[in-house]
Amino acid sequence: MAKNTAIGIDLGTTYSCVGVFQHGKVEIIANDQGNRTTPSYVAFTDTERLIGDAAKNQVALNPQNTVFDAKRLIGRKFGDPVVQSDMKHWPFRVINDGDKPKVQVSYKGETKAFYPEEISSMVLTKMKEIAEAYLGHPVTNAVITVPAYFNDSQRQATKDAGVIAGLNVLRIINEPTAAAIAYGLDRTGKGERNVLIFDLGGGTFDVSILTIDDGIFEVEATAGDTHLGGEDFDNRLVNHFVEEFKRKHKKDISQNKRAVRRLRTACERAKRTLSSSTQASLEIDSLFEGIDFYTSITRARFEELCSDLFRSTLEPVEKALRDAKLDKAQIHDLVLVGGSTRIPKVQKLLQDFFNGRDLNKSINPDEAVAYGAAVQAAILMGDKSENVQDLLLLDVAPLSLGLETAGGVMTALIKRNSTIPTKQTQIFTTYSDNQPGVLIQVYEGERAMTRDNNLLGRFELSGIPPAPRGVPQIEVTFDIDANGILNVTATDKSTGKANKITITNDKGRLSKEEIERMVQEAEKYKAEDEVQRERVSAKNALESYAFNMKSAVEDEGLKGKISEADKKKVLDKCQEVISWLDANTLAEKDEFEHKRKELEQVCNPIISRLYQGAGGPGAGGFGAQAPKGGSGPGPTIEEVD
């Protein structure tokens, strides 16, 4: 085998997994304990550092110095509410170093602090070593997966962790996308299929909808909950047994970290047992103050303890379907990913939601992501095997991208959930006469007004030759590449003069929570936004109409065809409306519409006389055929704004 083998690593919140694509198929590699998944745990003792199973196995003896959940810290600030709330549940200490969280442990008798990237890099090093032991040669190239909603700093930090571990990170890819690749390889040549990936892991929950067509994957929508997974089910069991211990023995063990940790380990084991049996027993010797704790739990009781959590997995499913504009009947395949999808109740809820549809469990849920990452790694290394040759991968823009137009309106060029890479072009124009330049302000978000969205950057296109408003044509292009880098270009069509801005993901892009918040708020505020949008559009319509009427009667070509009195009447009324507009920019929609009707009553009779008589015998014939009260339809004037 060539020495430049690339591996795929699923760096999970609680467990990680590594795979390699060779001899035309994927091998998921077992660690030295014979396990195909390895705990994402790092432990520090007086004598050594342990990673994986060894770290997790001694956690009850050494809770303060056993670090897990680094994925919940990576790429986040110390002040992040997520970090603050998670810290309450961790037995290890997290300290603040310049608003960056660090994990503080005692190692070989000294106090040490590590960045989350460093902890994750230790897990990645372990995965790299597992692969090297299997392949028999050093490995440097890897594809690492992250949750679909990781923001740029989280992705960057994960990449950094790979670099610290001595890996050349070929690409960071989304976990659901990786699972889809794993799935797509098994399923080629069936026409276009919509696949829903339901990924319930140890710490996170992601739902993704993909379209797979002839080897091409498109991500149609993603949704999820950063804080739902197997650990939450363990917590429910732990709380249940802490209460039971209180009832039976009148003692509270919740403050004793070692007791809680031993109980948690037993609960996790019981939970796994309940996926295949209807009852599980716990036997913990000398759990607290010498008391042995022997008890049992039924599957039904476990399901009841977690019923709200299980049910809540369906909300993101509904949201993803809405975003992908699909009905549940249009989903061809349901794919289960993540160890927690082995729970029968979770499977049943999903199956019932999709009216009894079969679930695809053909891929081992723990291994699907690493499987796909291994395939992607082979593609990026140029593997010539026909199994991977024609596999393409398309991602989506998580938020709409657009620019600000008159009145602070958000005009989206690239809609949310558009497949990237993509390129969209639209023509805009000037807002006032002889305007020398335009300010292009680029925003992301779902709200109607830019002030409620997130400003990504701005630039000016100057040197526009003097011209009446609405005449210059400015072509604006939004071009977003496969890595999510956005280029915005503005070109003045008359001069060919252009200017551009490049917005990379790290320029204040939003985190998953913010994206979710914006999307939720957008739904909540949709009604208010609609009113505002209509108001601005009524204002713009009135303004355009006034300026158009003004320029129509001032047209040199009409000299002598319109009486000075009529001309003055129109100009005065237009001027009155324009002044009123300047003074009343915040008027309501119906006020703008009322003003427009007033203006039309003055202008329409005059303009229609003008156009009806346009081919008539000289100017004299006009008076005779003027329709009373302007019953002739006014001209339809195209609005340019």
UniProtKB/Swiss-Prot annotation:
Modification sites for Phosphoserine: S631
Induction annotation: By heat shock.
One MF annotation (Gene Ontology) recorded for this entry: ATP binding
Tissue specificity field: Testis-specific.
Region entry Disordered, spans: 617-641
Localization of this protein: Cytoplasm; Cytoplasm, Cytoskeleton, Microtubule organizing center, Centrosome
Biological processes annotated in GO: positive regulation of microtubule nucleation; protein refolding; regulation of mitotic spindle assembly
Pfam entry (one): HSP70
Region ranges (Substrate-binding domain (SBD)): 394-509
Record PTM Omega-N-methylarginine, positions in chain: R469
GO CC annotation: centrosome; cytoplasm
Phosphothreonine found at: T636
Main location: cytoplasm
Bias (Gly residues) ranges: 617-633
Modified residues (N6,N6,N6-trimethyllysine): K561
Residues carrying N-acetylalanine: A2
Post-translational modification: In response to cellular stress, acetylated at Lys-77 by NA110 and then gradually deacetylated by HDAC4 at later stages. Acetylation enhances its chaperone activity and also determines whether it will function as a chaperone for protein refolding or degradation by controlling its binding to co-chaperones HOPX and STUB1. The acetylated form and the non-acetylated form bind to HOPX and STUB1 respectively. Acetylation also protects cells against various types of cellular stress.
Highest taxon above the source species: Eukaryota
Known role: Molecular chaperone implicated in a wide variety of cellular processes, including protection of the proteome from stress, folding and transport of newly synthesized polypeptides, activation of proteolysis of misfolded proteins and the formation and dissociation of protein complexes. Plays a pivotal role in the protein quality control system, ensuring the correct folding of proteins, the re-folding of misfolded proteins and controlling the targeting of proteins for subsequent degradation. This is achieved through cycles of ATP binding, ATP hydrolysis and ADP release, mediated by co-chaperones.
Family classification: Belongs to the heat shock protein 70 family.
Domain notes: The N-terminal nucleotide binding domain (NBD) (also known as the ATPase domain) is responsible for binding and hydrolyzing ATP. The C-terminal substrate-binding domain (SBD) (also known as peptide-binding domain) binds to the client/substrate proteins. The two domains are allosterically coupled so that, when ATP is bound to the NBD, the SBD binds relatively weakly to clients. When ADP is bound in the NBD, a conformational change enhances the affinity of the SBD for client proteins.
Protein name: Heat shock 70 kDa protein 1B
